[in-house]
Amino acid sequence: MASSRAQWFNPIAFTPWPVTCITTIVYLALLIPILVINLVVPSAPETNPKGVNLTEAWRDLQHLTGGFHPYNSRRNDEVHEWLLSRINSIIRPTVEAGQPSSANDNLPEVFVFDDNRSNLTYSNGGVGKTSIVGVYFESTNIIVYIRGSEDGLENWWEHSNGKPKGKGGVLVNAHYDSVSTGYGATDDGIGVVSLLQLLRYFTTPGNNPRKGLVLLFNNGEEDYLNGAHPPEADTTQAQDDTRHTNIDSLWHMLSASIGTTEGLVSYTGMDFDGKSKDQNKVNSGTGTLGVWFDMFGTAFAVFRLHTLFAISVALLVIAPLVIFVTSVILSKTDRMYLFSMSKSLEGTGDQVSLRGLRGFSRTPIILVIATTIPICLAYLLEKVNPYIVHSSQFSVWSMMFSAWIFLAWFLACAADFFRPSALHRAYSYTWIFIATWIMLVINTVYANQKGIAAGPSTAEFPGAAGEDTDPTESTSLLRGQRTTFANYRSSRPGGAAETDEREDINKGGTFEHEQSWSWTLPRWTWVLQLLLLAPIVLILVGQLALFLTASMCQVGSDGVSTFVVYLACSVFTTLLCIPLFPLIHRFTYHIPTFLFLVFIGTLIYNLVAFPFSPANRLKTFFIQEVDLDNGSNTVSLTGIQPYLTDAINSIPSAAGQNITCDKTTPFGKLERCSWSGLSPNVLGQGRERDNEIDPDKWITYNITKTVGKNKARIEISGRNTRACKLKFDRAVANFQVSGSAVDHRMPPTSRQGVSEIRLWSRTWENTWVVDINWHESADKSDDDDDDHDDENHDAPQNILSGKAICMWSDGNQPGVIPALDEVRLYAPSWIAISKAADGLVEASHSFTIQ
């Protein structure tokens, strides 16, 4: 009786209360820090680190985000001049290039390049037979070069054929333009002020870079040129300002930038030196594929992909061998119970029932059922309230997590009640090992063939070894100190019912109705198994799951199916709960019952709650199109229904109009609704000389066709803008902009042709001269022998039609785009306005070349 009482009060025994309490503590101890790391930004230091001025950085961010500053805005020019002024004020104490001073001998040379000369013509490359989009862009980038101690002292850029000498340098880049509907605090204002602080840091005595450092302030990133598409809605809206961020967020990025850049400029290895594999790229070495993961926000574990491949191959071979050898040893020492139905008694031939297969199949069955429920919940949310994850991602997580745990606990307890088995845990780890080994095989193949490192990279789970270990080398699993089956009580030949009395078994230390021999098993190994498996899964999978939902929870407003998000949540729920499953049948009813109530509450909330709020707004896309030929003025909002209609109904100018909606947008579930809106004043308020200009004079264009050839020259210019484009009803074969530079690494067109040419200039009201040529229509063809006449065959096949369009993107001044002002004023608070295209207003003239 004494031993039974001692076992009962064992704080790490494999009994309900220790299992419930310890498992809960372990999970909370791991999940809470992961949540805090992902949700709470580290505090900025109270005092400025050496070479950094946080107060100055915050003031810079406030100034930068004082207005919308897209490339096609006057405010963008102001930001450009302000950046030059800030850069010069920072480097003023340093040595001027070519004028060394004895007082500043320990400071690096700094060179500032205001790029107002370069331009580039390129295209998006096209897909299949789809026509591509060509772009002509004139740079207004700012380049700051900090000479490294290993760099050559020659100003090689001053020579026409000059080339840099020494080892490779480091490039850090940020764009200083914003979208036309956002102030650009996070996209990419924090990046810009981080570059300014990097400049201050590396021009501070004692922080000189070993390698040359180039800080690139680029312009025009938001307007197609680099195609940034942020995962969060607010980065393209008016909430992307300093009111909705803080100095802690600024320090978070700045500290990472300083640490990373300092490591790069101080690197002494040769990995980034030498010729590149691609001759069209800068000679920066061949590099290697890397693998890394975060350790509680304090450090990165970094190693090469081939190292992961080698470890994976070793685990694939060693892990099964270890399991096999362990199984052989257990069998040889008469201690192997897994997969054993019975044992023969020595000398009698009678069979002793061991019930060794009991519990073998319950693990995959229960896991499949428990995993199916979150998938069904994902489908239910997609059908009933698909956008609830937009604002309530943790409610979705709570629903799926609680549903999985309760159902798995209920099924495991039911199976354990009807068919109790001491080997439930051993078989669970065995199945987990098999599944992990298979996933590791897949991961290893992808790492080797595709260069992809994803999925499980370990194959632990020793399976039966921990479960079947006996306290001593001489003690049998079956009973007492016997080493053979010779003295065991025999059973009936056909069967297998044990005749031990339950009272004796309980006194011997078995748990309820499990096999009588189980009292000899160690009671503490489950703690080691939990501590081995849970941290690995929760640290790696937990952070990945939170990152995934944070980046994808608002993709529904972009027209992407949210079922992908819910399905990912359901899969990650299973992965996060896997360490619990071998132990879950020992849980008391308290936590599963509580989680069942959580499931009911979150399910109801997720099905009926309104998915958007002022803090988590629905993104809609605005554009106003003016046809200068017929004077029509169309305002369009693109978004998801029925919320888009609710927003439009609140706009006064749309009241009483016939709102037309269609699904012709390329954005999946999005609809575009249009109505006749307020007329824009794109020439600007207060420009008296332009007030009387008719809208049809906003754009001037001229077309000159080469006689007898499918060639033409188009001249186009717009008032108060520096962005226009040409759209063609069918693709042109080639184009060239007067004065443009072509880089063979980025061809302006391909055999598919160009259906649209976008033109960007650093000069306001610039006139672009574009030469185009096109092929005859492919329609004339194979139907010439048809009996019926098609009048289209008689039409000239070398006609080219299209539109000359100019764009206006400056929404800083009220009254310039009244339709946009109206939408911002009257749309519900849970609606956010973003741009639908490069311009907020697009005016067009149609043309035909024949």
Curated annotation (Swiss-Prot):
Signal sequence interval, chain numbering: none
Cross-referenced InterPro entries: M28_fam, Peptidase_M28, PFF1_C, PFF1_TM
Cofactor note: Binds 2 Zn(2+) ions per subunit.
Subcellular location: Vacuole membrane
Group of enzyme by EC: hydrolase
Keywords: Glycoprotein, Hydrolase, Membrane, Metal-binding, Metalloprotease, Protease, Transmembrane, Transmembrane helix, Vacuole, Zinc
Catalytic residues, chain numbering: E221
Gene Ontology biological process: proteolysis
TM segment ranges: 21-41, 283-303, 309-329, 364-384, 394-414, 426-446, 530-550, 564-584, 591-611
Residues reported in the UniProt entry to bind Zn(2+) 1: H175, D187
Vacuolar face of the membrane: 42-282, 330-363, 415-425, 551-563, 612-850
Residue positions with a glycan: N53, N116, N119, N630, N658, N702
GO cellular component, one term: vacuolar membrane
Main localization, broad class: membrane
Topology with respect to the bilayer: Multi-pass membrane protein
Ribonucleoprotein listed as a keyword: no
SUPFAM superfamilies: Zn-dependent exopeptidases
E.C. designation(s): 3.4.-.-
GO molecular function, one term: metal ion binding
Topological domain spans for side Cytoplasmic: 1-20, 304-308, 385-393, 447-529, 585-590
Binding site for Zn(2+) 2: D187, E222
Record-linked Pfam families: Peptidase_M28 (PF04389), PFF1_C (PF22250), PFF1_TM (PF22251)
Known cofactor(s): Zn(2+)
Family: Belongs to the peptidase M28 family.
Task of the protein: May be involved in vacuolar sorting and osmoregulation.
Protein name: Vacuolar membrane protease
Organism: Ajellomyces capsulatus (strain NAm1 / WU24)
